[in-house]
Structures are given as structure tokens and as C-alpha cells.
Amino acid sequence: MEQAKAVAKQVRIAPRKVRLVIDLIRGKQVGEAIAILKHTPKAASPVVEKLLNSAIANAEHNYEMEPNNLVISEAYVNEGVTLKRFRPRAQGRASRINKRTSHITLVVTEKKEG
């Protein structure tokens, strides 16, 4: 079965926060998923929505799939590189702040007939 995918790497949002959004759309039809993302007040929502639109465009252009029949078959988030930063603290000390990044992957396939 044909599948189209889109990957966003080094997204500056923690994987734990992106997973909350990804879990909402996994297994859904793309139209329904876009509607869910538009009404989800999370920072990761616009990023995931843009990625989903990219996956739909890939399916349409590269594999000639029908956009109305697409379903999100796989959606997962992996941890990217962690940027280490320092925050000044009292008494001349410093604490390390981890700025986490994510690699987001969406795979869409055509819904089976019947």
C-alpha cells in the first residue's frame, strides 16, 4: 500500500509537549485532523498542521492519491538535539537549562474501501 510521509526536524518544542497534540490526530482522517488542530490551543498545533498539509501535498503530488481518502496511519515524535543554555542564579551560580527539540513524523495512507 502506498504511503506518503512528511518529517519536520529540529522543531524547537519539547517532544513531551508535541506528543500531546500528535496523540489527538493519530488514526484520524486528514480533514478531521486539520479541524482538531485548528481548535487545539497548543504551541505545537500550527507546526503539526503545517506538517500534515505537507504530507497531504506529498501524497497528492508524488503518489497521485486522493486527498479526501487519506488517513493518518503513523504519527510519532522523536527527541532531537538538546540545546544547553545557562541561567544566572543567586550567589554567582548558574543553572543549566535544556532547550529540547523534536523530530516529528507523519505518514498518510489511502483509506481502504469497505
Curated annotation (Swiss-Prot):
Belongs to the universal ribosomal protein uL22 family. This protein binds specifically to 23S rRNA; its binding is stimulated by other ribosomal proteins, e.g. L4, L17, and L20. It is important during the early stages of 50S assembly. It makes multiple contacts with different domains of the 23S rRNA in the assembled 50S subunit and ribosome. One of its GO terms (biological process) is translation. This is Large ribosomal subunit protein uL22. Signal peptide: none annotated. GO terms for cellular component: cytosolic large ribosomal subunit. The lineage of its organism: Bacteria, Bacillati, Bacillota, Bacilli, Bacillales. It holds the Pfam family Ribosomal_L22. HAMAP family: Ribosomal_uL22_B (MF_01331_B). It comes from the Bacteria. It comes from Shouchella clausii (strain KSM-K16). Part of the 50S ribosomal subunit. The gene is rplV. Keywords: Ribonucleoprotein, Ribosomal protein, RNA-binding, rRNA-binding.
